[in-house]
Amino acid sequence: MSDPTQKIAVLGAGSWGTALAALVARHGHPTVLWGRDAAMVDAIDRTHENPRYLPGIALPDSLRATTDLQQTIAGASWILVVVPSHAFTETIKLLAPLRPAGAGIAWATKGFEPGSGRFLHEVARDILGPSVPLAVVTGPSFAKEVTLGLPTAITVHGDDAAFAQVVADAMHGPTFRAYTGDDMVGAELGGAMKNVLAVATGVADGMQLGLNARAGLITRGLNEMLRLAAVIGARPETLMGLAGLGDLVLTCTGDLSRNRRLGLALGRGQSLSDAIREIGQVVESVQTADEVMRQAEQHGIELPISNAVRAVLHGEITPEAGLKELLARERKPEYPQTLFT
């Protein structure tokens, strides 16, 4: 059961950071939300609304917001990082010297470290040292629906079972189910790859290729997740659960997904720059596609859908050419016999 006396610090005042801060605040936890944009943070603190990312949705009166990182973290029982993947390393470095003794670090960031392609738990462990409890929060969850109190299920995977349970308990409530696990590699892989695959289904829908094409891309996309999972030490059941299949289905079919919307725009003939400008928020797939293919090349495996997305995002091929290449590939058994062994 969650301890309501725990102070929780949430770093990142975008849509997902705000939604999770509001969630734990509603469950009775003293919660402070940190952001860099002074005007937006002030609006959250005074009016209890995030006018940029969650307009018109009331946030708990008890939720505080500030641009002062030290004030946010001071006295926190644990810290939740919810920033884009390109800001993750910097944020962990900023919080490291301010972290109260014993406070674990969780994050709801999805993606890899840009440039290195490292998993985020590897980045956090290198910066924070061997003794700090770590956990990743992931699964099929749109910020708007969580903030509105609509039913949601996520999972918390950590290298410290007790800390993962603390995080899950703080989030779990009448309309929000939080499960736990210990496969951080699988949990982070699913959360990253689904963004790339959502672009593929968005492109197909933008080109009006039909529901059969969408279902085929989702299923073969899951195959690519499992193929990469098998060579990097992730467990297949993690990818068949909320962290993989669940998040994949949501992101590939729900128009609240920024990555799906990017694909829709590209499939309708829009340029990448125009599509990103229209979305107006960070679209993780643009960076993540490169890192997914870096992992694939390191391990000598083929990920044709992910590679096609990467090529389209770099302007190397058109969506039409990418589709033609995928349809022309040599047929193989649906699943290699070794995939689940």
Curated annotation (Swiss-Prot):
It is found in: Cytoplasm. One of its GO terms (cellular component) is cytosol. GO terms for molecular function: glycerol-3-phosphate dehydrogenase [NAD(P)+] activity; NAD binding. It catalyses: sn-glycerol 3-phosphate + NAD(+) = dihydroxyacetone phosphate + NADH + H(+); sn-glycerol 3-phosphate + NADP(+) = dihydroxyacetone phosphate + NADPH + H(+). PROSITE patterns: NAD_G3PDH. Gene3D superfamilies: N-(1-d-carboxylethyl)-l-norvaline Dehydrogenase, domain 2, NAD(P)-binding Rossmann-like Domain. Pfam families: NAD_Gly3P_dh_C (PF07479), NAD_Gly3P_dh_N (PF01210). NADPH binds at S15, W16, R36, K110, A143, R258, V282, E284. Sn-glycerol 3-phosphate binds at K110, G139, S141, K194, D247, S257, R258, N259. The active site is at K194. InterPro entries: 6-PGluconate_DH-like_C_sf, 6PGD_dom2, G3P_DH_NAD-dep, G3P_DH_NAD-dep_C, G3P_DH_NAD-dep_N, NAD(P)-bd_dom_sf. SUPFAM superfamilies: 6-phosphogluconate dehydrogenase C-terminal domain-like, NAD(P)-binding Rossmann-fold domains. Pathway: Membrane lipid metabolism; glycerophospholipid metabolism. GO terms for biological process: carbohydrate metabolic process; glycerol-3-phosphate biosynthetic process; glycerol-3-phosphate catabolic process; glycerol-3-phosphate metabolic process; glycerophospholipid biosynthetic process. Keywords: Cytoplasm, Lipid biosynthesis, Lipid metabolism, NAD, NADP, Nucleotide-binding, Oxidoreductase, Phospholipid biosynthesis, Phospholipid metabolism. Its EC number is 1.1.1.94. It is an enzyme of class 1 (oxidoreductase). Transmembrane segments: none annotated. NCBIfam families: PRK00094.1-2, PRK00094.1-4. Belongs to the NAD-dependent glycerol-3-phosphate dehydrogenase family. Catalyzes the reduction of the glycolytic intermediate dihydroxyacetone phosphate (DHAP) to sn-glycerol 3-phosphate (G3P), the key precursor for phospholipid synthesis. This is Glycerol-3-phosphate dehydrogenase [NAD(P)+]. The gene is gpsA.
